[in-house]
């Protein structure tokens, strides 16, 4: 939850914003929760997986775009005021394609909050310079967000634990990773011991 919240903070999400979340893993889904917490009026989740789309909607996504590339970008922009793009983008993947999408759907003056660990990402400096798109991000300072987020969980305002769709013991850690890799689990929960 802390990393998804960090993406929203880095994207400078504020009340009334139209926000896009690129990535439907646990971090992206928690980014949906965070955008809602920060007052976004419209939250667009880019997701190709039915189970994640459903959970994203339950978490607060108002729209889901399953397409990628230019078609996905066009569909996101079609949901914005005059098609100019979103106010804030949460980039929660770390691939070059996801970063390019994030930049392409951002309106002039928007901010991309990136928390996906970058893998061969190229930043098109001229595009962000002339498009006046800001990029902020990095590792999440989760301890800084813990009091706020834990309070929201304990009050029942949010339930990010729903991203754990598979539970097993430490002895089956390889299976836990395989299930996530094969998109059979959003996030695996490892039980060290039964309490």
What are the language-model segments listed below?
Residues 1-38, 78:
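Short internal alpha-helix immediately C-terminal to a glycine-rich phosphate-binding loop
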Residues 11-13, 80, 93, 106-107:
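A generic alpha-to-beta junction signature in SAM-dependent methyltransferases
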Residues 21-24, 36-101:
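Adenosine-nucleotide cofactor-binding segment
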Residues 48-49, 118, 141:
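Residues in the short beta-alpha loop(s) of Rossmann-like NAD(P)-binding domains
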Residues 104-120, 135-136:
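ADP-ribose/adenylate-binding Rossmann-like module
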Residues 116-132, 144, 148-151:
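Rossmann-fold NAD(P)-binding glycine/threonine-rich loop
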């Amino acid at each position: 939850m802390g990393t998804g919240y960090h993406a929203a903070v880095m994207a400078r999400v504020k009340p009334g914003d139209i926000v896009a979340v690129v990535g439907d893993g646990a971090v992206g889904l928690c980014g949906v929760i965070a955008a809602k917490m920060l007052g976004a009026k419209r939250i667009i989740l880019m997701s190709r997986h039915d189970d994640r789309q459903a959970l994203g909607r339950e978490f607060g996504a108002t729209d889901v775009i399953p397409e990628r590339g230019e078609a996905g970008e066009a569909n996101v922009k079609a949901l914005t005021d005059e098609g100019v793009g979103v106010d804030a983008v949460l980039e929660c993947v770390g691939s070059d394609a996801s970063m390019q999408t994030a930049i392409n759907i951002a309106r002039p003056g928007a901010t991309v909050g990136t928390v996906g660990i970058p893998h061969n990402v190229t930043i098109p400096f001229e595009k962000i310079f002339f498009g006046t798109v800001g990029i902020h991000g990095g590792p999440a300072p989760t301890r800084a967000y813990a009091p706020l987020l834990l309070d929201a969980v304990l009050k029942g305002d949010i339930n990010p634990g729903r991203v754990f769709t598979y539970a097993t013991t430490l002895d089956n850690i390889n299976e836990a990773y395989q299930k996530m890799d094969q998109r059979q689990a959003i996030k695996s929960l490892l039980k060290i011991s039964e309490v």
